[in-house]
Design a protein with these regions (language model features):
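Hydrophobic transmembrane alpha-helices and their immediate loop junctions
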Residues: 1-224
Length: 224
């Protein structure tokens, strides 16, 4: 499925809907399951739009993909503008933080609307609004964990690179590996199998990244 939000291309893979349905498998009512999938879709789109809009402010052309692991926003430089790889720490941190904080702002708007008296008596709508609030807060907090490839991990890497360009990536991946293992072990103790899978996957990805860094030449600082 492909469409545009304004000028931002959005592509949704079929695996995204499978992932959302699996996460909502405890919903026995088909209508409530569809509602849950819609909530996940809206929440992750809001998150990725946060990245996309801030990237656009910095002269990048964003595109959004929703897939079996959530969402990704990719950037190409606009004509005559620098690529993201040449950005300094502050811009990279702002782009990374924009996703979680877009979700927090959306959840805050929902809460503000309720305080203002904008309510509904429809039970299904109330459930959807409650889930939208919870998912946007929860997804934002999860993404702020200092673990690559999450947003918090990208913030950490931008900072460690600023502190040590030569060793920044290695430090970021080591911290990410420790956090991923911790998440997997904690989730295992609580039989939270999806979180076990995510922790294991992210641990594997960071181990692979560390192995590649061992064989790679020292990184060159981008020219700005």
């Amino acid at each position: 499925m492909q469409f545009k939000l304004g000028s931002i291309p959005v592509r949704i893979q079929g695996y995204f809907f499978i992932m959302a349905a699996v996460l909502g498998a405890n919903e026995r009512d088909p209508v409530r399951l569809l509602m849950w999938v819609a909530v996940v879709l809206v929440s992750i789109l809001v998150h990725e739009l946060g990245h996309a809009l801030v990237g656009r402010l910095f002269g990048l052309a964003p595109s959004i993909a929703l897939h079996g692991m959530g969402g990704t926003t990719s950037f190409e430089p606009l004509p005559g503008r620098p690529a993201r790889a040449s950005f300094g720490t502050a811009k990279n941190v702002l782009i990374s933080l924009a996703g979680p904080f877009a979700g927090f702002a959306f959840a805050g708007a929902l809460y503000g609307a309720e305080l203002a008296g904008l309510r509904t008596e429809n039970a299904l709508a109330l459930r959807a609004l409650s889930l939208l609030f919870a998912v946007n807060i929860g997804w934002g907090i999860f993404n702020l964990l200092p673990m690559l490839p999450l947003d918090g991990g990208n913030v950490m890497r931008a900072i460690t690179r600023a502190l040590s360009w030569r060793h920044g990536d290695r430090v970021a991946h080591v911290v990410s590996l420790v956090v991923a293992i911790g998440i997997a072990l904690y989730a295992l103790s609580r039989s939270q199998w999806w979180s076990v899978y995510l922790g294991g996957l992210f641990a594997f990805q960071n181990i692979q990244a560390l192995r590649q860094l061992q064989d790679a030449p020292p990184p060159q600082r981008a020219v700005r």
